[in-house]
């Protein structure tokens, strides 16, 4: 897939995510573009893979390009960046008491804070979020 096709897929993925839930996430764009298989994403979320880049079907240059195009789309559409803390799924309590230990997930091999932040930043359409909230049926208490 050439860069032009990839840009189209990235922007389309972001548009659809924003319409459905009001925000777009890099991992979902990677899944939508075919760079990250859903099963590999789940393996990473459950802690079976050390870092996300290891299971992506693209080199680091292409991954960087995807993240850059997401930022370009976000700036053009005035989306608000929002950091999201990714933690491991399925962590069980040892004896059923106390809090579950929180295990942070790593996106890149290097673990560089800038790279990690760029993967963990979701882009929010505040106006669309308000529309979606208004469209939800109100529950009475």
Q: Residue locations for each model-derived region?
A:
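Positively charged, polyanion-binding regions of nucleic-acid-associated proteins
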Residues: 3-27, 32, 36-37, 42-55
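Phospho-regulated, low-complexity intrinsically disordered regions of nuclear gene-regulatory
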Residues: 60-141
